[in-house]
Amino acid sequence: VGWTRNIRVAALVAVAALGLTACGGGDDKPAAAGKGGAPIVVASFNFTDSQILAEIYAQALEAKGYPVTRKLNLGSRELIYPSLKSGELQFIPEYQGSAIAAGFGKDPVKDAKGEHEQLAKLLEPSGVSLLDYAAAEDKNTYIVKADLAQSKGLATISDLKKLDKVVLAGGPECEKRLTCFKGLTDVYKLTNATFQTVQELGPRVQQLDSGGVTVIPVDSVSPQAGDSKYVALKDDLSMVPTENVVPAVTKKVLDERGADFAAAVNAVSAKLTTEGMRDLNKRVDSDGEKAADVAKDWLSQQGLV
């Protein structure tokens, strides 16, 4: 997720201009201990998967009686992390590998548990903690056309060596990233690979379908990653780090809200899967539904509301 999303990051603007300060909320009913006070400010990055996840967690908390204010579609970590540190934002669903690499400029370790520990240590000085990570991931996945995979025996990224020529299409940042084209040449040692800049996903898919390019990166939760027209190549040399979804929450909120709050959040994370998120992303991006509506449906289906 995160490493190819510069093309989706809006220009940074002043935090004050976005009005990130939490708004108060009234409730005539007496609140249970840990559930009163100012709303919890739940944020998201500016892409579909993040917005859906933020809605899922926000609605789950509201169903448990916690007041919530949403600040969605905000932009990049450059904006959001300072606001988490200051307490203006208090909760965001993160992606472990990207948070480590893009948020702190560090190399992620190669497993989800290790990443969780690594990210927790990096966030600790900012007064931010992590709750349980989910099985769901939103990471770079590399797809080829299914007929090409079948005819050439392509199942892994390493198998691209079988081809005379490999053309990878991606955003301009892909060319120099070890998780993208540079990884094909430096990690997988492909000498038959060339790069073609295609900024947006739609034209990239069109180029793949027409045979103009061989392979493209997509998000693992995108409809293309699960489409039978394509084959997602296994990252057999672990070029791309794990990107498990993990709620990042300010320590102040965790201390104030207590164990029941953490349990409510962890119950949501325990139900999230990559396949499930792919379906929700399709409903928003392809079918035109609203993130809040698909989040509500999912929570109901999972028995969480």
Regions found by a protein language model. Give the residues of each.
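Bacterial signal peptide processing site
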Residues: 24-27
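C-terminal motif of bacterial Sec signal peptides marking the signal peptidase cleavage site
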Residues: 19-22
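Ligand-binding pocket segment of bilobal, Venus flytrap-like solute-binding proteins
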Residues: 90, 166-236
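Short helix-initiation/N-cap motifs at beta->coil->alpha
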Residues: 48, 70-82, 194-206
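Short, polar/charged alpha-helical segment
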Residues: 48-67, 89, 182-186
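A conserved helix-loop-strand patch within extracytoplasmic ligand-binding domains
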Residues: 112-168, 251, 270-274
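Ligand-binding "clamshell"
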Residues: 103-111, 116-131, 210, 224-238
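Extracytoplasmic "Venus flytrap"
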Residues: 33-55, 72-76, 173-175
